[in-house]
């Protein structure tokens, strides 16, 4: 019999990503000037953090190490991550922990609704970890959160950023029936890179999920995003745009991939601001209602302002016939 001893000292912090410990370290590139942001520290930032803590909430801003946390929290914009801080997937780009998640918190819907009210949000973004361990992938919990927010803050518009509900029959339909204002699901990268970057997901399943939202309820805005700088080609990015438009996706976001640790996927290159502008111009010409493309663009970055622009863009398109 062989006994394997735990070499961690009692009370020592365990590594955040033990599932990636076997991977060789990848090089970390120095960030260019256009990527760097100011460290957070304002009084409003501290107030936002306190409200999040008081309601025992998890935010993707913190868990994913978002570079925009200082700017967003200073505006009292925080993206709530429901169903815990532990994901059942192990995507090579993501900083969220992987493992066996805890049971769902039955108080979470009301806690989220309370935080939304205290922050005075006009528009809120709700995302989640993947919960492959749940029969419906967490769809019913999403619905409970949406309904709790609507009861407490009926004037607040709701944007959800969901997992793919892979092999969860009826889950998508359940969430769409709750009628969020925006349904976001990120494709994340080009199909060629899925096996390395997003191994637990399927590109065309994700694309079909977004198309299905429009089939069920055409009034719901659909949104999706990709990261660049992972080794994709320009032609592949343009093909993803075409795929998204064929699925009637309204809003496209494109941002620079930033490597959380040396155990995560390496940055292939930093895409320049001019290249992002070019992507935005091309995407607009393909018919998206709204496009956000910049090095620091993230799914929920400026979501409040973007939702207003999205509604205006739809109204303008309808008036043109």
UniProtKB/Swiss-Prot annotation:
It catalyses: [[Fe-S] cluster scaffold protein carrying a second [4Fe-4S](2+) cluster] + N(6)-octanoyl-L-lysyl-[protein] + 2 oxidized [2Fe-2S]-[ferredoxin] + 2 S-adenosyl-L-methionine + 4 H(+) = [[Fe-S] cluster scaffold protein] + N(6)-[(R)-dihydrolipoyl]-L-lysyl-[protein] + 4 Fe(3+) + 2 hydrogen sulfide + 2 5'-deoxyadenosine + 2 L-methionine + 2 reduced [2Fe-2S]-[ferredoxin]. It is an enzyme of class 2 (transferase). The keyword 4Fe-4S applies. It is found in: Cytoplasm. SUPFAM superfamilies: Radical SAM enzymes. Keywords: 4Fe-4S, Cytoplasm, Iron, Iron-sulfur, Metal-binding, S-adenosyl-L-methionine, Transferase. Its cofactor is [4Fe-4S] cluster. Pathway: Protein modification; protein lipoylation via endogenous pathway; protein N(6)-(lipoyl)lysine from octanoyl-[acyl-carrier-protein]: step 2/2. Residues 1-26 are annotated as: Disordered. CDD domains: Radical_SAM. InterPro entries: Aldolase_TIM (IPR013785), Elp3/MiaA/NifB-like_rSAM (IPR006638), LIAS_N (IPR031691), Lipoyl_synth (IPR003698), rSAM (IPR007197). Its EC number is 2.8.1.8. [4Fe-4S] cluster 2 binds at residues 87, 91, 94. Residues 73-289 form the Radical SAM core domain. Signal peptide: none annotated. Binds 2 [4Fe-4S] clusters per subunit. One cluster is coordinated with 3 cysteines and an exchangeable S-adenosyl-L-methionine. One of its GO terms (molecular function) is 4 iron, 4 sulfur cluster binding. It comes from the Bacteria. PANTHER family: LIPOYL SYNTHASE, LIPOYL SYNTHASE, MITOCHONDRIAL. Belongs to the radical SAM superfamily. Lipoyl synthase family. This is Lipoyl synthase. The lineage of its organism: Bacteria, Pseudomonadati, Pseudomonadota, Alphaproteobacteria, Hyphomicrobiales. The gene is lipA.
